[in-house]
Amino acid sequence: MILLGQPLHKVPEYFSRKGATAPRKQRLNSSVASLRAAREILSELMLLFAPIDVLNDLLLKTGLSADQINFFVWPLIQIGLVVTLVALWVAYATYLERKISAFMQARLGPMRVGPWGLLQPIADGLKLLTKEDFIPENADRWIFFFAPYIAVASAFIVFSVIPFGPDWAVIADVNIGLLLVLAVSSVGVLALILAGWSSNSKYALLGGLRSSAQMVSYEVAMGLSLIGALMFARTLSMSGIVAAQASDSIWFIVYQPAGFLLFLISGIAENNRAPFDLPEAESELVAGFHTEYSGMRWSLFFMAEYAAMVVVAAVATTVYLGGWYFPFVNRLASVNYNLYVIVSLLVFLVKTSIILYIYFWLRWTLPRFRYDQLMDIGWKWLIPSALINIVLSGFAIFLIQALNGWRGITTIETLDRGLNMTATGKGIMIGIGILGVFITAALLARINWRSRDFNLKIQRRNIKLVNVPKGKPAVQVES
């Protein structure tokens, strides 16, 4: 333990005092030299992640002004990086889903292409590029052509306001970022309707109508579930929401467990993922709204679906899991700011990947709901739950403010960056958040106690037994 605290240039001196032999000294000197070389290489690699120090100097040498670099060149570089990384993320999300499903079913999954099947997404992409781009004879060609691009664009535009990390790890810090996410992501509904209608297929049209009804229904619950967290953040900026959680040193999922569950369920239904994948029910609608699509256009819908899953996971990470914030990571900023940004990026990716794993886990665990159950969950359960959560959150904040200063009790520290509370205020808020889950469940059970969609007892009572007709059968079989 004493050796771990020694600087590199004092390690040989430490062993010489301890009476180390010559061969051991030589091995030690070579090890120290290797460590120094590794540290120099690491420091040089860190320069690659210092855009202000290195890349800005290179760009200034090209003759561009500082304003052109800041407002034109840098956004293009960030957009290119985000699109490339998200596309790779989406490609390997399919690989992870196949591996997870194989693990649950005691199989190996993709193993043929590359080591452990790691090149399988690349092989799938090449296969789709070589497939025939088939367009139905009576389809509306232009709408049929543009629908997949609308779906992909609506998913990828959202990443422009997602804070993957501090400083240069976010493309645009918009003061209405969360509202922009909800507005742009809802455009994806238009792509599915256009794809179903332009295909001139009854199965595609029914799939498009189902998806539009489902997504519009669950968008309401998704938006309402975020209001409770916004009451604590006091801003619509995505970076501001992360800063509010960092300044209060706590994630909003602790205050809003019900809001997080509501948002996650609504997001899964919004993405048409199992158990809410009614628009793509194979037994009823073949492949839903993309039944008539093939080749690369079909893969664009596939990419849009997985990109939308990443969007929901990233928004849940930002609003409820602290985004790139993690305890004690901010101390790296004073040591090496570039390392701090990289570690923050990794923290964000790990949190988002955990939520994506929940997506895959639920798909291979739960059966598909009936359509009436699907709509009832959205309108009779999630929307009332979100409204109850808003009322309870408002009551909790009112109680915290009312108790502040009462009989020497201090519950609020500051309101500069969100609602920053003392340990007493945090304890009260956590208790109300946990209690709110049970209050919401009790109220929903009371509201829907006569509903027969999920009540097996009522369904059994409504079953009418058919009396067996009297007499002999028309055709008698002789034994």
Residue positions per predicted region:
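Short, low-complexity, charge-dense intrinsically disordered segments
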Residues: L4-K10, R17-S43
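Selective transmembrane helix interface/packing segments
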Residues: L45-S479
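General helical secondary-structure elements
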Residues: E13, A20-P23, V32-L35, Y95, ...
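Short linear motifs in intrinsically disordered/low-complexity regions
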Residues: K10, F15, S30, V54-L58, ...
